[in-house]
């Protein structure tokens, strides 16, 4: 919180994606020594104690003048990440390779990946589709749902549930046995989205990710378990909240 308010980075996501290189106790001790010594001391502290992220690029890759389909096909190798090593920091390691959006987005994202898979399907990248679905299945089995992305700061929220549509894509390539293979994970995710539905009533019509409409029908909604600023957009959320208060 202190660091995010210092405005040392133009992007709030930079610090929360940094990897600690020393123990928490050591970092705390070093911070206490320099916390009132200005920006240059703070930057040195960050460089000495954290591996700071940069925008991921692929050496030697340049946008060319080929047609859009060829350009996209070339991008798969640029945006593909191998299975993760177990590191400290906020990244949740995934057991299989996956595609990232790129730039400041260095991790897999839930519903984005469905549209990525549609492109992968066109280019015959079925194994990559399989690996990404297996990563999402891993997250369902580990956490009971698919987070916004594979970062610990995303564990309080999900994104629109496209997992079943991803299974449809894979089934188109590998046949209907795919549905049986992933049925346990499909059911677990459904239970996550429907949690609390039996406790809804006309008086208490909203709970977690379920909403009871006046006619008795049930809808799902976007919901975050936390009501605090998002770590990856901390400064922006604080500003939005302040502006909302001032406006009212």
Predicted feature locations:
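Acidic, mature catalytic/reactive cores of soluble proteins
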Residues: 1-248
